[in-house]
Protein backbone atom coordinates (compact mmCIF):
# COMPACT_ATOMS: atom_id res chain seq x y z
CA UNK A 1 0.00 0.00 0.00
CA UNK A 2 2.92 2.37 0.69
CA UNK A 3 3.94 2.24 -2.98
CA UNK A 4 0.39 2.98 -4.11
CA UNK A 5 0.18 5.96 -1.76
CA UNK A 6 3.46 7.31 -3.13
CA UNK A 7 2.20 6.80 -6.69
CA UNK A 8 -0.92 8.83 -5.95
CA UNK A 9 1.15 11.63 -4.43
CA UNK A 10 3.37 11.55 -7.51
CA UNK A 11 0.57 11.90 -10.05
CA UNK A 12 -0.72 14.86 -8.02
CA UNK A 13 2.21 16.79 -9.50
CA UNK A 14 0.27 16.86 -12.79
CA UNK A 15 -1.95 19.53 -11.22
CA UNK A 16 1.11 21.78 -11.16
CA UNK A 17 2.73 20.66 -14.43
CA UNK A 18 1.79 23.07 -17.21
CA UNK A 19 0.60 21.97 -20.65
CA UNK A 20 3.36 23.86 -22.39
CA UNK A 21 2.66 23.90 -26.12
CA UNK A 22 0.75 27.17 -26.14
CA UNK A 23 3.69 28.90 -24.47
CA UNK A 24 5.20 29.17 -27.96
CA UNK A 25 2.39 31.47 -29.12
CA UNK A 26 2.54 33.76 -26.12
CA UNK A 27 -0.09 32.20 -23.87
CA UNK A 28 0.73 32.99 -20.24
CA UNK A 29 -2.15 31.29 -18.45
CA UNK A 30 -1.31 27.71 -19.37
CA UNK A 31 -3.59 24.93 -18.21
CA UNK A 32 -2.20 21.97 -16.31
CA UNK A 33 -1.55 18.50 -17.66
CA UNK A 34 -4.14 17.21 -15.18
CA UNK A 35 -6.78 19.55 -16.61
CA UNK A 36 -5.90 18.41 -20.12
CA UNK A 37 -6.18 14.72 -19.17
CA UNK A 38 -9.55 15.19 -17.48
CA UNK A 39 -11.23 16.90 -20.42
CA UNK A 40 -9.55 14.52 -22.88
CA UNK A 41 -10.98 11.56 -20.95
CA UNK A 42 -14.48 13.01 -21.12
CA UNK A 43 -14.10 13.75 -24.84
CA UNK A 44 -12.90 10.17 -25.29
CA UNK A 45 -15.95 8.77 -23.53
CA UNK A 46 -18.25 10.91 -25.67
CA UNK A 47 -16.46 10.00 -28.91
CA UNK A 48 -16.72 6.30 -28.13
CA UNK A 49 -20.46 6.46 -27.54
CA UNK A 50 -20.88 8.42 -30.79
CA UNK A 51 -18.77 5.94 -32.75
CA UNK A 52 -20.70 2.99 -31.33
CA UNK A 53 -24.00 4.58 -32.32
CA UNK A 54 -22.72 5.48 -35.77
CA UNK A 55 -21.10 2.16 -36.65
CA UNK A 56 -22.92 -0.35 -34.46
CA UNK A 57 -19.72 -1.23 -32.61
CA UNK A 58 -19.26 -2.16 -28.96
CA UNK A 59 -16.10 -0.27 -28.01
CA UNK A 60 -15.73 0.40 -24.29
CA UNK A 61 -16.07 4.12 -23.46
CA UNK A 62 -14.83 3.36 -19.96
CA UNK A 63 -11.63 1.83 -21.30
CA UNK A 64 -11.03 4.81 -23.59
CA UNK A 65 -11.55 7.23 -20.69
CA UNK A 66 -9.20 5.17 -18.52
CA UNK A 67 -6.50 5.21 -21.20
CA UNK A 68 -6.70 8.99 -21.31
CA UNK A 69 -6.74 9.54 -17.56
CA UNK A 70 -3.41 7.71 -17.22
CA UNK A 71 -1.70 8.51 -20.54
CA UNK A 72 0.30 11.58 -19.44
CA UNK A 73 1.48 10.32 -16.05
CA UNK A 74 5.07 10.01 -17.26
CA UNK A 75 5.16 13.79 -17.65
CA UNK A 76 5.43 14.07 -13.88
CA UNK A 77 9.07 13.07 -14.29
CA UNK A 78 10.04 14.61 -17.64
CA UNK A 79 7.66 17.56 -17.92
CA UNK A 80 5.36 18.37 -20.83
CA UNK A 81 7.75 18.83 -23.74
CA UNK A 82 6.44 20.89 -26.65
CA UNK A 83 7.26 20.07 -30.28
CA UNK A 84 10.33 22.30 -30.46
CA UNK A 85 11.84 20.58 -27.42
CA UNK A 86 11.05 17.22 -29.01
CA UNK A 87 13.35 18.18 -31.88
CA UNK A 88 16.30 17.81 -29.49
CA UNK A 89 14.99 15.30 -26.96
CA UNK A 90 13.34 11.95 -27.71
CA UNK A 91 10.31 12.78 -25.61
CA UNK A 92 8.42 9.61 -26.56
CA UNK A 93 11.19 7.35 -25.34
CA UNK A 94 11.75 9.40 -22.19
CA UNK A 95 8.06 9.48 -21.33
CA UNK A 96 7.70 5.75 -21.90
CA UNK A 97 10.68 5.04 -19.65
CA UNK A 98 9.19 7.24 -16.93
CA UNK A 99 5.76 5.62 -17.28
CA UNK A 100 7.21 2.10 -17.03
CA UNK A 101 9.28 3.00 -13.96
CA UNK A 102 6.23 4.53 -12.29
CA UNK A 103 4.21 1.34 -12.73
CA UNK A 104 6.96 -0.88 -11.31
CA UNK A 105 5.82 0.12 -7.83
CA UNK A 106 2.23 -0.98 -8.44
CA UNK A 107 0.67 -4.44 -8.04
CA UNK A 108 1.47 -6.64 -11.02
CA UNK A 109 -2.02 -6.86 -12.51
CA UNK A 110 -2.57 -3.12 -12.13
CA UNK A 111 0.78 -2.32 -13.73
CA UNK A 112 0.04 -4.70 -16.61
CA UNK A 113 -3.25 -2.95 -17.33
CA UNK A 114 -1.71 0.53 -17.25
CA UNK A 115 1.08 -0.56 -19.60
CA UNK A 116 -1.55 -1.94 -21.98
CA UNK A 117 -3.34 1.41 -21.86
CA UNK A 118 -0.11 3.23 -22.64
CA UNK A 119 0.71 0.94 -25.56
CA UNK A 120 -2.76 1.29 -27.07
CA UNK A 121 -2.56 5.06 -26.86
CA UNK A 122 0.94 5.44 -28.29
CA UNK A 123 0.65 2.78 -31.00
CA UNK A 124 -3.02 3.25 -31.90
CA UNK A 125 -3.21 -0.51 -32.44
CA UNK A 126 -6.72 -0.93 -31.02
CA UNK A 127 -10.00 0.85 -31.65
CA UNK A 128 -9.84 2.21 -28.11
CA UNK A 129 -6.34 3.53 -28.72
CA UNK A 130 -7.38 5.27 -31.93
CA UNK A 131 -10.32 6.99 -30.26
CA UNK A 132 -8.18 7.93 -27.26
CA UNK A 133 -5.60 9.59 -29.50
CA UNK A 134 -8.31 11.50 -31.35
CA UNK A 135 -9.69 12.68 -28.01
CA UNK A 136 -6.26 13.81 -26.84
CA UNK A 137 -5.76 15.81 -30.02
CA UNK A 138 -9.27 17.22 -29.83
CA UNK A 139 -8.73 18.49 -26.31
CA UNK A 140 -5.75 20.48 -27.55
CA UNK A 141 -7.86 21.78 -30.43
CA UNK A 142 -10.61 22.89 -28.05
CA UNK A 143 -8.02 24.69 -25.92
CA UNK A 144 -6.62 26.31 -29.06
CA UNK A 145 -10.09 27.47 -30.07
CA UNK A 146 -10.51 29.13 -26.67
CA UNK A 147 -7.25 31.03 -27.19
CA UNK A 148 -8.24 31.87 -30.79
CA UNK A 149 -11.60 33.30 -29.72
CA UNK A 150 -9.77 35.45 -27.17
CA UNK A 151 -7.73 37.00 -29.96
CA UNK A 152 -4.66 34.80 -30.35
CA UNK A 153 -4.94 34.02 -34.06
CA UNK A 154 -1.75 31.93 -34.01
CA UNK A 155 -3.73 29.20 -32.25
CA UNK A 156 -5.40 28.32 -35.56
CA UNK A 157 -2.37 26.18 -36.45
CA UNK A 158 -3.20 23.76 -33.62
CA UNK A 159 -6.77 23.41 -34.85
CA UNK A 160 -5.81 22.81 -38.47
CA UNK A 161 -3.07 20.32 -37.60
CA UNK A 162 -5.42 18.34 -35.37
CA UNK A 163 -8.09 18.35 -38.06
CA UNK A 164 -5.67 16.70 -40.50
CA UNK A 165 -4.65 14.04 -37.99
CA UNK A 166 -8.05 12.83 -36.78
CA UNK A 167 -9.11 9.31 -37.75
CA UNK A 168 -12.62 8.69 -36.44
CA UNK A 169 -15.75 9.99 -38.14
CA UNK A 170 -17.16 11.41 -34.92
CA UNK A 171 -13.97 13.32 -34.15
CA UNK A 172 -13.99 14.83 -37.65
CA UNK A 173 -17.60 15.92 -37.22
CA UNK A 174 -16.86 17.33 -33.78
CA UNK A 175 -13.96 19.52 -34.88
CA UNK A 176 -15.97 20.82 -37.83
CA UNK A 177 -18.72 21.94 -35.46
CA UNK A 178 -16.19 23.27 -32.96
CA UNK A 179 -14.67 25.57 -35.59
CA UNK A 180 -18.07 27.18 -36.11
CA UNK A 181 -18.76 27.62 -32.39
CA UNK A 182 -17.49 30.36 -30.10
CA UNK A 183 -16.22 28.97 -26.83
CA UNK A 184 -18.70 31.16 -24.93
CA UNK A 185 -21.79 30.02 -26.84
CA UNK A 186 -22.72 27.42 -24.23
CA UNK A 187 -23.73 30.03 -21.65
CA UNK A 188 -25.27 32.71 -23.87
CA UNK A 189 -28.80 31.33 -23.68
CA UNK A 190 -28.40 30.68 -19.96
CA UNK A 191 -27.86 34.41 -19.39
CA UNK A 192 -31.06 35.58 -21.09
CA UNK A 193 -33.33 37.62 -18.86
CA UNK A 194 -36.19 35.85 -17.18
CA UNK A 195 -39.10 37.70 -15.68
CA UNK A 196 -41.47 36.49 -13.04
CA UNK A 197 -44.64 38.32 -12.10
CA UNK A 198 -44.90 38.80 -8.35
CA UNK A 199 -47.68 40.80 -6.67
CA UNK A 200 -48.40 42.69 -9.85
CA UNK A 201 -44.75 43.66 -10.38
CA UNK A 202 -42.21 42.14 -12.76
CA UNK A 203 -39.05 41.03 -11.03
CA UNK A 204 -35.97 40.49 -13.16
CA UNK A 205 -34.03 37.27 -12.68
CA UNK A 206 -30.84 35.92 -14.20
CA UNK A 207 -29.24 39.30 -14.63
CA UNK A 208 -25.80 38.30 -13.34
Model region roles, listed by residue range:
Residues 1-208:
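Alpha-helical, largely C-terminal catalytic domains
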Amino acid sequence: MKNIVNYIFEIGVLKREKHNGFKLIGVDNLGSVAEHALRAAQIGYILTVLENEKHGTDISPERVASILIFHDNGEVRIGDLHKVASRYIDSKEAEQTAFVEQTERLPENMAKTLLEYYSEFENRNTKEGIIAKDADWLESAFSAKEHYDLGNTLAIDWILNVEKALETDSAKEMIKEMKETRFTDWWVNLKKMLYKKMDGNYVEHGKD
